[in-house]
């Protein structure tokens, strides 16, 4: 499975051990200060993106020396650094894109990063946002299998569209059958699987799933 992992410049204390997310099929991309986070973890990114306005001159020289390819942008532009890096990753058509370093900083950036998940829905490429407490994904209509993860026991479903039609949860502590939920609903916050596996399905809308721990 081809994986592209992107590390943005969020607080390092919220980023999990990155060495647990790599294998011979994984490409790593650094975004702005996230490139320094990668180098500190002993991982050399294949590409680095950003205006690099949040790093020191010493860190910039370190990135220039280590990264095989550097994409430098003006601070004033029409896309965020992460958005530009994600577009590059999507063009490579991987099986999955995992993004780290996207929580714990500015709320406007975080909400913008949540919206970037929609690019995965449009291109049929799985995108997952990851920090130490949360895994966040976005889904189009369909039926999906889900495995229990004791490290991320809580599972929440949040509408990203005005309506979610015929939402069904099977194998959950709080099951649903063909339920209609609307934007702003908190009905599906903090559910749990009661078996090793479960399923969720819906007929119309766009749904965010968050798997989390305290």
Curated annotation (Swiss-Prot):
GO MF term (any one): thiamine binding
EC code(s) of this entry: 2.7.6.2
BP GO terms, sorted: thiamine diphosphate biosynthetic process; thiamine metabolic process
Annotated keywords: ATP-binding, Kinase, Nucleotide-binding, Transferase
Enzyme class: transferase
Highest rank taxon of the organism: Bacteria
Secretion signal span: none
Alphabetized InterPro entries for the sequence: Thi_PPkinase (IPR006282), Thiamin_PyroPKinase_B1-bd (IPR007373), TPK (IPR053149), TPK_B1-bd_sf (IPR036371), TPK_catalytic (IPR007371), TPK_catalytic_sf (IPR036759)
Reactions catalysed according to its record: thiamine + ATP = thiamine diphosphate + AMP + H(+)
Pathway in which the depicted protein is active: Cofactor biosynthesis; thiamine diphosphate biosynthesis; thiamine diphosphate from thiamine: step 1/1
Function summary: Catalyzes the ATP-dependent phosphorylation of thiamine to thiamine pyrophosphate. Is involved in thiamine salvage.
Family assignment from sequence similarity: Belongs to the thiamine pyrophosphokinase family.
Designated name of the protein: Thiamine pyrophosphokinase
Species lineage: Bacteria, Bacillati, Bacillota, Bacilli, Bacillales
């Amino acid at each position: 499975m081809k994986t592209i992992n992107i590390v943005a410049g969020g607080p390092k204390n919220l980023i999990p051990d990155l060495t647990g997310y790599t294998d011979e099929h994984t490409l790593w991309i650094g975004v702005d200060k996230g490139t320094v986070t990668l180098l500190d973890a002993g991982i050399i990114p294949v590409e680095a993106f950003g205006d690099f306005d949040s790093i020191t001159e010493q860190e910039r020289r370190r990135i220039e020396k280590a990264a095989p390819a550097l994409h430098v942008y003006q601070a004033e532009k029409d896309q965020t650094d992460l958005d530009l890096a994600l577009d590059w990753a999507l063009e490579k058509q991987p099986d999955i894109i995992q993004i780290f370093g996207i929580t714990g900083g500015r709320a406007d950036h975080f909400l913008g990063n949540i919206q970037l998940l929609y690019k995965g829905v449009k291109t049929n490429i799985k995108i997952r946002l990851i920090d130490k407490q949360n895994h966040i994904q976005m889904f189009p209509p369909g039926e999906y299998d889900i495995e229990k993860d004791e490290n991320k026991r809580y599972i929440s479903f949040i509408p990203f569209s005005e309506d979610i039609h015929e939402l069904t949860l099977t194998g959950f502590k709080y099951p649903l059958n063909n339920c209609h939920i609307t934007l702003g609903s908190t009905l599906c916050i903090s559910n749990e699987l009661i078996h090793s596996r479960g399923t969720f399905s819906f007929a119309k809308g766009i749904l965010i799933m968050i798997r989390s721990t305290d």
